[in-house]
Amino acid sequence: MAPQKHRKICVMGSRAVGKSTITMQFVESHCPDSYHPTIENTYQKIIRHQGQEYSVEIIDTAGQDEYSILQKQYSIGIHGYILVYSVTSVSSLEVIKVLNDKILSSLGAEKIPRVLVGNKSDLDNERNISRDQGIQLANEWECAFVECSGKNNENVEEVFKQILNEVNKGSTGPEPPQKEGCILM
């Protein structure tokens, strides 16, 4: 059996789009009862995906806006990004576009492993962003797209499978061996 791989994933988006709900559904299989703004939480989960075992570290960030400064801890050592907007909020999609540009600029990259996620698909009667709009943006960014309902746990696992797929697409060759330390003589 192949050794376990570590993946560090950062979940980003504006306030109240459901980042914590998606993360908690995936990690703990439950939805928070009430909304409490997140400062920052880190979660761990061991999963098996496509025959490989992964230790997934998930950073659930505080809600951002277009004026937020991208914190260094959200760019250093991160393998992939889950960029979440609410299908009920046009402004949350605009924030995601700005965040995407900030991440690319911070990393000096044209493309990064990421998944665009339209959350709150259960609120279809309040929808302001069509599924096609999400797909179109994901196609422009050349990344995966998933619509989900964190509240109802619909497609939540798919979000995390897709980010692992995106990270693995960007991986070249085997991971470097773990350093064991050195001895100076």
UniProtKB/Swiss-Prot annotation:
Q: Which UniProt keywords apply?
A: Cell membrane, GTP-binding, Hydrolase, Lipoprotein, Magnesium, Membrane, Metal-binding, Methylation, Nucleotide-binding, Prenylation
Q: What does this protein do?
A: Binds GTP and exhibits intrinsic GTPase activity.
Specify one Pfam family: Ras
Please report the organism this UniProt entry assigns to the protein.
Dictyostelium discoideum (Social amoeba)
Gene Ontology molecular function: any one: GTP binding
Residues recorded as binding GTP, renumbered to this chain, are: 18-21, 35, 38, 119, 122, 150
Chief location of this protein? membrane
Question: Which InterPro entries does the entry mention?
Answer: P-loop_NTPase, Small_GTP-bd, Small_GTPase, Small_GTPase_Ras-type
Q: What is this protein called?
A: GTP-binding protein Rheb homolog
State if RNA-binding is listed as a keyword.
Answer: no
Using the UniProt record, name the top-level EC class of this enzyme in a single word: hydrolase
Localisation per UniProt entry: Cell membrane
Which residues are assigned to the propeptide feature? 183-185
Cellular component (GO) terms are: autophagosome; cytoplasmic vesicle; plasma membrane
Reaction catalysed by this enzyme: GTP + H2O = GDP + phosphate + H(+)
Say yes or no: keyword Lipoprotein present.
yes
Kindly list the positions at which Cysteine methyl ester occurs in this protein.
182
Residues that hold Mg(2+) according to the record: 20, 38
Where does lipidation (S-farnesyl cysteine) occur on this chain? 182
Q: What is its EC number?
A: 3.6.5.-
**Family indicated by similarity:** Belongs to the small GTPase superfamily. Rheb family.
